[in-house]
């Protein structure tokens, strides 16, 4: 018996994704393997200890990975492959419609949709991440400051997704918290409450246990978006290296300057 047409189409999509992603994945594997050599790691990754203690706090501090962390493991490769596949199959694209996926509020645990938080013609900033992602947590206060400074013309929403480095998966000793993989919605909501403690005053919601928002926006490990009038007008790079609060600040500054210009501002990154 021949498989159904939609099954064949899905298999072909998966095969195409594997062919396109495999070269990039293998390069990532090589990089992770090299980073397990301390001499290479110290040369490639600038640790926070190299920064001038008297310098002002940076919005996007350099990546810092302790020598105790293994980079090339089965769990790390599974996480990298998963993130690359999510990015390939995401439905959110610059200039296209914003996926209106379901999320859960922390207060009242009410099911709603992402675009419910969009108000009129104001930009809606989406910040996807989790407490076990060190680069995300290192930039959380910078995001909080930016949100406080731009609330007069933009809205901000933190979306808590699945853990980047769960303690029962790709463990990171640099993570602010040791949290296992979420087994139920309550696990995710408890973790999201920890994030809220680190960013008081920010609006936080949690992705559903189907990970619909994470998949639609290709958000794993962390990612930034701006939605305006139902369209994606800013799409940040995939974290950790593409996750840049400073770049988001520049976009918002340009938008504020040109808000009275011709139409919405769309910036490719």
Curated annotation (Swiss-Prot):
It is a single-pass type II membrane protein. Signal peptide: none annotated. The chain crosses the membrane at residues 15-35. GO terms for biological process: hormone biosynthetic process; thyroid hormone catabolic process. It is an enzyme of class 1 (oxidoreductase). InterPro entries: Iodothyronine_deiodinase (IPR000643), Iodothyronine_deiodinase_AS (IPR008261), Iodothyronine_deiodinase_I/III (IPR027252). GO terms for molecular function: thyroxine 5'-deiodinase activity; thyroxine 5-deiodinase activity. It comes from the Eukaryota. Residues 36-269 are extracellular. The keyword Glycosyltransferase does not apply. Its EC number is 1.21.99.3. The keyword Coiled coil does not apply. One of its GO terms (cellular component) is endosome membrane. It catalyses: 3,3',5'-triiodo-L-thyronine + iodide + A + H(+) = L-thyroxine + AH2; 3,3'-diiodo-L-thyronine + iodide + A + H(+) = 3,3',5-triiodo-L-thyronine + AH2; 3-iodo-L-thyronine + iodide + A + H(+) = 3,5-diiodo-L-thyronine + AH2; L-thyronine + iodide + A + H(+) = 3-iodo-L-thyronine + AH2. Keywords: Cell membrane, Endosome, Membrane, Oxidoreductase, Selenocysteine, Signal-anchor, Thyroid hormones biosynthesis, Transmembrane, Transmembrane helix. Residues 1-14 are cytoplasmic. Its main location: membrane. Plays a crucial role in the metabolism of thyroid hormones (TH) and has specific roles in TH activation and inactivation by deiodination. Catalyzes the deiodination of L-thyroxine (T4) to 3,3',5'-triiodothyronine (rT3), 3,5-diiodothyronine (3,5-T2) to 3-monoiodothyronine (3-T1), rT3 to 3',5'-diiodothyronine (3',5'-T2) and 3,3'-diiodothyronine (3,3'-T2) to 3'-monoiodothyronine (3'-T1) via inner-ring deiodination (IRD). Catalyzes the deiodination of 3,5,3'-triiodothyronine (T3) to 3,3'-diiodothyronine (3,3'-T2) via IRD. Monomer. Homodimer. May undergo minor heretodimerization with DIO1 and DIO2. Belongs to the iodothyronine deiodinase family. This is Thyroxine 5-deiodinase. The gene is dio3.
């Amino acid at each position: 018996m021949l498989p159904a047409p939609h099954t064949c189409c899905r298999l072909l999509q998966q095969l195409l994704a594997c062919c396109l992603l495999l070269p990039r994945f293998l390069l990532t594997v090589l990089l992770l393997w090299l980073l397990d050599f301390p001499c290479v790691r110290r040369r490639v990754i600038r640790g926070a200890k190299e920064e001038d203690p008297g310098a002002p706090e940076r919005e996007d501090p350099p990546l810092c990975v302790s020598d105790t962390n293994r980079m090339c493991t089965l769990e790390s490769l599974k996480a990298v492959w998963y993130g690359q596949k999510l990015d390939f199959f995401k439905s959110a694209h610059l200039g296209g419609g914003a996926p209106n996926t379901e999320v859960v509020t922390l207060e009242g645990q009410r099911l709603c949709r992402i675009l419910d938080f969009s108000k009129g013609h104001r930009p809606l900033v989406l910040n996807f991440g989790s407490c076990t992602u060190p680069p995300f947590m290192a930039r959380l206060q910078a995001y909080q400051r930016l949100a406080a400074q731009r609330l007069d013309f933009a809205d901000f929403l933190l979306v808590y997704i699945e853990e980047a480095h769960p303690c029962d998966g790709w463990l990171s000793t640099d993570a602010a918290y040791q949290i296992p993989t979420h087994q139920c919605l309550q696990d995710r909501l408890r973790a999201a409450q920890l994030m809220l403690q680190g960013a008081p005053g920010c609006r936080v919601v949690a992705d559903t246990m189907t990970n619909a928002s994470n998949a639609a926006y290709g958000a794993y490990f962390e990612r930034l978006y701006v939605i305006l009038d139902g369209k994606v007008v800013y799409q940040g790079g995939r974290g950790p290296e593409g996750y840049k609060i400073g770049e988001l600040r520049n976009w918002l500054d340009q938008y504020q300057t040109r808000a009275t210009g011709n139409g919405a501002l769309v910036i490719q990154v």
